[in-house]
């Protein structure tokens, strides 16, 4: 059975009961030439643990774009970063829909079978998964819809195409039901524009247009709190339209809810009553233990004590059941203290940020580093600068060619940061998600045309909530410590929310306890002028626009406080120039690039080896980028390249001068005999010796082992040829 729904700037064609009919729910969704299959499967046996055992997998098939997987193994292997992040979006959007106490292992699989380059796979993937879940026998009684909002030509656009999104200042992804918002991800996208600046004419007869200077201006495109609320409201109306359309089309096809046993919120009410009567103060004292490991230890002691009590022995209360009830009672106390007394576990006010300390360039040999500590959360963020050759290449199903990423952010969360003895493993979904959020927050502040490839690594050394936002703050200062001239400092703060009946409380800079026992995790990052990135996950049924606005403005006050401290630290940064890579960027005639490369790359390899530098070339623009550890090596390599591109006999690929052939070119190569003597001039001095100009612009290397006294550029000395291999000439001093 097929349904066609035209909504939110796209036509969605759903196929029901056509494929995967043994799954609890399945739907095939087509938008233009994109086809996605979403399935839902459920086990019949509950897990004993107190959590929702939901697994979401998003898989892109290479054949969807008419490709065969690259590499030695010609099949899809582990998911890429985009697949992992998309699976997280779907998971976070659908998880709040499941009823409390649902403990049946459930798997949602979304497979991309055909990919249209212009269709947003994250929007289509979530909508397909939502309908499949809604149609299943799992007691989920409302569909979720995901939409993306762009900001193009000063107006909001719903579900822009992939090409349209590239010209957008905003990338906002919102998921929700017709009544509530469930998940939000947002980033601002920096844009460059040309700016004409009039200058004073030197020659009054000059063409007036030549009296103008054209410069590039970059706008971070931060969004104010009001504009964000406006954009989310715009998305909410689109979600309402789609959700109503889904319900109307599919409610008749929804399977009857399976008869499932839901776990009670409190496994044994008598234990809860007993704890409240005899151990309430002990639980409150345990809550005040800030470290997760210490708090767990104290609660464990209380559980053991209760289990040894005569009442527990008589009633047959098992320690495991007592621990579960105690954990839920602890959550109740935390929430009651916040709602009724305005008191947080660490004694802070609801809008108070924990104490902050900042140290920069704590690692002497790293390009830039920052140790950012906020309460019991500590991030060591390290910046490394590289060249174009260090950039990350990756494939996207909707792009024909590999994309190049020159700004990377890696987030690492070792077990010792929370006092656990756990093995160090490859980064999981959480690490990838936190790193991606920090990257999105900082990216607009970095020059789009930066000559460097930049890698930030955040090592979480302590964690008690908000480690991703500590990574943003530390990352902004690590960039400055590495000499990267970012446009503005960016700070981040994690917000929380507690709902009890008709009361609610918004919390600034939440710690781990408040994250675990609260109803919302809302991370907001930005500069003093607005928001560059945010992420919201909701644990209850949803959140209203009014409460969201309150949280945004409270986050702004917290962010401004943090930025003030960061500006103080920034003013004290001393960049360690000695460890930074040296970079030279210059242009030559594009036709001369081939002379720099040489036959089969021989010349450029010799330059790289001789001067110990890395070289990146732009054939079309004629741009040459040289990077190295020593400035004199970089300068010497630049001089050498300029010399070989300025020779009259150098010529571009395919430009054969009239009357010359390959034999003429061979005859033009300088040839010397061993022992030939010359009055040479020192052209450049490098770590391993000096380059001496002999005749006709030909250079030779006088190795440092043969130099007895210091040499300077321009010195004249008598040398002789000791060896020649191709164009490489080795020299010795003539006594």
From Swiss-Prot:
Stretches assigned to the KH domain: 581-641
Cofactors (names): Mg(2+)
Location of the protein in the cell: Cytoplasm
Record key words, sorted: Cytoplasm, Magnesium, Metal-binding, Nucleotidyltransferase, RNA-binding, Transferase
Positions of region (Disordered): 649-671
Source taxon at top rank: Bacteria
GO molecular function: 3'-5'-RNA exonuclease activity; magnesium ion binding; polyribonucleotide nucleotidyltransferase activity; RNA binding
Pfam families assigned: KH_1 (PF00013), PNPase (PF03726), RNase_PH (PF01138), RNase_PH_C (PF03725), S1 (PF00575)
Protein function: Involved in mRNA degradation. Catalyzes the phosphorolysis of single-stranded polyribonucleotides processively in the 3'- to 5'-direction.
Protein's UniProt name: Polyribonucleotide nucleotidyltransferase
Species assigned in the record: Campylobacter curvus (strain 525.92)
Organismal lineage: Bacteria, Pseudomonadati, Campylobacterota, Epsilonproteobacteria, Campylobacterales
């Amino acid at each position: 059975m097929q349904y066609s729904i035209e909504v939110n700037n796209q036509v969605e064609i759903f196929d029901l009961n056509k494929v995967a009919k043994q799954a609890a729910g399945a739907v095939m969704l087509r938008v233009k030439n994109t086809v996605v299959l979403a399935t839902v499967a459920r086990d019949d046996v509950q897990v004993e643990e107190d959590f929702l055992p939901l697994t979401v997998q998003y898989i892109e098939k290479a054949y969807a774009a008419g490709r065969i997987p690259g590499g030695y193994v010609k099949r899809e292997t582990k998911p890429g970063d985009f697949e992992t992040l998309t699976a997280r979006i779907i998971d976070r959007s659908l998880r709040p829909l499941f009823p409390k106490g649902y403990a049946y292992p459930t798997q949602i699989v979304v497979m991309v079978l055909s990919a249209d380059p212009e269709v947003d796979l994250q929007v289509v993937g979530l909508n397909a998964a939502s309908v499949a879940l809604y149609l299943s026998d799992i007691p989920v009684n409302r569909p979720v819809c995901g939409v993306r909002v762009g900001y193009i030509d000063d107006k909001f656009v719903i579900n822009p195409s992939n090409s349209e999104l590239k010209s957008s200042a905003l990338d906002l992804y919102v998921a929700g039901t017709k009544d509530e918002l469930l998940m939000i991800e947002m980033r601002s996208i920096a844009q460059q524009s040309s700016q004409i600046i009039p200058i004073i004419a030197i020659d009054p007869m000059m063409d007036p247009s030549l009296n103008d200077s054209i410069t590039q201006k970059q706008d971070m495109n931060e969004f104010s709190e009001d504009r964000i609320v406006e954009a989310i409201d715009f998305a909410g109306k689109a979600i309402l339209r789609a959700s109503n359309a889904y319900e109307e089309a599919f409610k008749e096809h929804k399977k009857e809810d399976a008869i499932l046993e839901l776990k009670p919120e409190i496994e044994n009410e008598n234990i809860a009553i007993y704890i409240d009567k005899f151990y309430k103060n002990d639980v409150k004292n345990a809550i005040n233990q800030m470290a997760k490991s210490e708090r767990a230890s104290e609660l464990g002691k209380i559980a053991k004590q209760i289990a040894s009590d005569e009442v527990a022995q008589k009633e047959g209360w098992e320690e495991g059941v007592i621990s579960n009830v105690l954990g839920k009672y602890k959550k109740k106390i935390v929430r009651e203290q916040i709602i009724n007394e305005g008191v947080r576990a660490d004694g802070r006010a609801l809008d108070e940020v924990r104490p902050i300390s900042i140290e920069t360039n704590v690692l002497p040999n790293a390009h830039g580093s920052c140790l950012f500590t906020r309460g019991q959360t500590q991030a060591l963020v390290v910046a490394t600068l590289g060249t174009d050759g260090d950039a990350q290449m990756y494939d996207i199903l909707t792009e024909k060619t590999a994309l190049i990423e020159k700004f990377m952010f890696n987030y690492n969360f070792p077990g010792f940061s929370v006092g656990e003895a756990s093995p160090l493993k490859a980064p999981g979904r959480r690490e990838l998600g936190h790193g991606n959020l920090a990257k999105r927050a900082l990216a607009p502040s970095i020059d789009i045309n930066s000559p460097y490839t930049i890698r930030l690594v955040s090592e979480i050394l302590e964690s008690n909530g908000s480690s991703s936002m500590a990574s943003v703050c530390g990352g902004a200062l690590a960039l400055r410590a590495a000499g990267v001239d970012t446009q503005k400092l960016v700070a981040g703060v994690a917000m929380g929310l507690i709902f009890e009946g008709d009361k609610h409380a918004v919390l600034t800079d939440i710690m781990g306890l408040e994250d675990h026992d609260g109803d919302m995790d809302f991370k907001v990052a930005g500069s003093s002028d607005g928001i560059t990135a945010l992420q919201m996950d909701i644990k209850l049924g949803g959140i209203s626009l009014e409460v969201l606005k309150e949280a945004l403005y409270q986050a702004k006050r917290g962010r401004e406080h943090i930025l003030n401290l960061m500006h103080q630290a920034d003013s004290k940064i001393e960049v360690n120039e000695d460890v930074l890579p040296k970079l030279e960027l210059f242009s030559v005639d594009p036709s001369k690039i081939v002379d720099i490369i040489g036959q089969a790359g021989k010349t450029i390899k010799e330059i790289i080896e001789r001067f110990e530098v890395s070289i990146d070339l732009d054939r079309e623009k004629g741009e040459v980028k040289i990077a190295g550890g020593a400035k004199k090596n970089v300068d010497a390599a630049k001089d050498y390249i300029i010399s070989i591109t300025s020779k009259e006999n150098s010529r571009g690929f395919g430009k054969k001068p009239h009357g010359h052939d390959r034999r003429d070119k061979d005859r033009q190569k300088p040839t010397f005999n061993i022992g030939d003597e010359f009055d040479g001039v020192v052209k450049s001095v490098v770590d391993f010796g000096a380059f001496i100009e002999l005749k006709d612009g030909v250079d030779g290397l006088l190795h440092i082992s043969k130099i007895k006294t210091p040499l300077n550029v321009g010195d004249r000395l008598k040398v002789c040829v000791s060896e020649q291999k191709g164009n490489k000439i080795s020299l010795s001093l003539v006594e």
